[in-house]
């Protein structure tokens, strides 16, 4: 038997018992006699765990695919499949994308707006995030459009516009208390990823470096290896090694196609308000408003999250 937990998280203020019962029914019906329900646990008014056992041996990805109809049929509830083992809650490394994940914006689009090339950059970004364009090539195309931009005041102006996603500071604080290492791996730029790292008190950051000429202008190029999907995956493994963390105890959170390799490498992966293709390919999707909801996926209750015990 294989043990799993199905976490149901409502987008609204409440998760009705009728909805939980319906999802449990759909789980058993979609899996014939392979699945048995072993009980539920209320995490909050918005979230509930459904514990199941599956006959035989099956991995998370295959069970998620088997339950695709259940997952996709509830637009106002995220249905997340996790392995019910010690690593579900005992995460020791969380790796985050930056743009549209830790922060609401895409930094390169903010710079593009400053440079008057917003439309061109946005179109390339969309294609890259939907996995329709190689990330390295898309980055080169976008950065090239920024050539000649004076950076003396640009960096400070952009930093002032960055808005941290709701729930991120609280999530980071909670995870740090649980002795979890936190990192940001960004296909964006170190000039801003480093700033976000410092703002949130993260342990590590890696991103691309914009090249600046002797006149203080962007050259339209980056320096060093590009941080793409493969780089994120390899860096996640390196961080596991550096921090002595089992890969099973790691988690990747992101919204773009270039986050998928690291999600597949990590012990678990979360597509945060991601593009449809990314949601489908990722281990799970979370489309709520606050990133503290990730703690429900780990099995924490509101009492534990908000220290009400």
Curated annotation (Swiss-Prot):
Source organism superkingdom: Eukaryota
Active site: 97, 99
EC number(s) given by UniProt: 3.1.3.3
Gene Ontology molecular function, alphabetical: L-phosphoserine phosphatase activity; magnesium ion binding
Sites where the protein binds substrate: 106, 142, 186-187, 232, 258
Catalysed reactions listed for this entry: O-phospho-L-serine + H2O = L-serine + phosphate; O-phospho-D-serine + H2O = D-serine + phosphate
Pfam families in the record: Hydrolase
Family: Belongs to the HAD-like hydrolase superfamily. SerB family.
Miscellaneous information on this protein: Present with 13800 molecules/cell in log phase SD medium.
Name used for this protein in its record: Phosphoserine phosphatase
Native organism: Saccharomyces cerevisiae (strain ATCC 204508 / S288c) (Baker's yeast)
Gene: SER2
């Amino acid at each position: 038997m294989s043990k799993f937990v199905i976490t149901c998280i409502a987008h609204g203020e409440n998760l009705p018992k009728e909805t939980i019962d319906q999802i449990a029914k759909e789980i058993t019906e979609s899996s014939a006699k392979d699945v048995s329900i072993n009980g539920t646990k209320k995490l909050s008014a918005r979230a509930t765990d459904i514990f199941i056992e599956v006959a035989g041996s099956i991995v998370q990805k295959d069970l998620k695919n088997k339950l695709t109809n259940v997952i996709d049929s509830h637009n106002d509830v995220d249905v997340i499949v996790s392995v019910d083992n010690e690593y579900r809650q005992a995460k020791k490394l969380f790796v985050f994308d930056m743009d549209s994940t830790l922060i609401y914006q895409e930094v390169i689009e903010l710079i593009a707006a400053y440079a008057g090339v917003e439309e061109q950059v946005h179109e390339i970004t969309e294609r890259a995030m939907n996995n329709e364009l190689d990330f390295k090539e898309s980055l080169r195309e976008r950065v090239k459009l920024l050539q000649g931009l004076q950076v003396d005041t640009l960096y400070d102006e952009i930093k002032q516009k960055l808005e941290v996603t709701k729930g991120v500071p609280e999530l980071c604080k909670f995870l740090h208390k649980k002795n979890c290492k936190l990192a940001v791996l960004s296909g964006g730029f170190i000039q801003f990823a480093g700033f976000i790292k410092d703002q949130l008190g993260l342990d590590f950051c890696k991103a691309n470096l914009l090249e600046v000429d002797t006149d203080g202008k962007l050259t339209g190029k980056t320096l060093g290896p590009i941080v793409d999907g493969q780089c994120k995956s390899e860096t996640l493994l390196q961080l596991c090694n550096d921090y002595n963390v089992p890969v099973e105890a790691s988690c990747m959170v992101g919204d773009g196609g270039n986050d998928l390799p690291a999600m597949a490498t990590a012990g678990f992966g979360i597509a945060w308000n991601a593009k449809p293709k990314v949601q489908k390919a990722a281990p799970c999707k979370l489309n709520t408003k606050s990133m503290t909801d990730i703690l429900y996926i780990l099995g924490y209750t509101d009492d534990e999250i908000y220290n009400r015990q």
